């Protein structure tokens, strides 16, 4: 999967899940999204809180080829689950790498699934797929399960800081300023195309948490 599943290094190792790193820039310096090894999480979030300029970049096709090829050389087939196509074009890079490698390894199988999810929801899907693998399900069975059940994961989340919604162009500067004054916490989720959709504008953190709990009960 991709590092954007937001599982810990220890969890990836314990579940025997391989991952490829995205990239990000912090104040013009590029880092690998390598789960806090290049820059500790506390330093990263402190820099963001201080107003650092941030930018992300997806994995390119060449990087995917370098990531996939050792498995193929070892005689293994591959099932790779990507970050949602609704927020990233990374699946396109993975598909290009798949096509290139299948020409060189015609006896091997490379299956790619668009998770239509992100962060801990994406990680939850990966955990379930690892369970199926450990139960002895075949690669094709795990692939079909992922395709069929990926939308059973519901993503609901909020932020009390509108700064990065403004920087990302999701809300205007005016709306961000007004929202900050009024203590508005946007509640978002991911739709069936894996896109981030603002659903509610709720005043105060306590009320938005209550709404998320209600959504958990609704979709459980």
Where are these regions (language model features)?
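N-terminal glycine-rich anion-binding loop in soluble enzyme alpha/beta folds
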Residues: 1-63
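Mixed-charge interfacial surface used for oligomerization/domain docking
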Residues: 4-12, 17-23, 79, 86-99, ...
């Amino acid at each position: 999967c991709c590092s954007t599943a937001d599982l810990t290094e220890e969890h990836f190792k314990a579940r025997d899940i391989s991952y490829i790193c995205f990239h990000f820039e912090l104040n013009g310096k590029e880092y690998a999204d390598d789960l806090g090894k290049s820059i500790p999480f506390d330093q990263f979030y402190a820099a963001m809180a201080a107003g650092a300029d941030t930018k992300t970049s997806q994995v390119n096709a060449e990087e995917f080829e370098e990531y996939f090829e050792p498995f193929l050389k070892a005689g293994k087939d591959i099932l790779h689950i990507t970050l949602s196509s609704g927020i990233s074009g990374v699946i396109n890079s993975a598909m290009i790498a798949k096509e290139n490698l299948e020409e060189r390894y015609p006896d091997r199988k490379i299956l790619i699934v668009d998770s239509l999810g992100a962060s801990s929801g994406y990680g939850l899907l990966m955990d379930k797929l690892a369970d199926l693998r450990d139960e002895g399900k075949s690669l094709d069975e795990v692939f079909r399960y992922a395709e069929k059940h990926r939308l059973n994961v519901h993503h609901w989340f909020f932020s009390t800081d509108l700064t990065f919604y403004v920087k990302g162009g999701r809300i205007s500067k005016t709306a961000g300023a007004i929202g900050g004054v009024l203590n508005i916490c946007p509640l978002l989720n991911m739709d069936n195309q894996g896109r981030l959709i603002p659903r509610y504008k709720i005043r105060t953190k306590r009320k938005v948490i209550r709404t998320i709990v209600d959504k958990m009960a609704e979709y459980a």
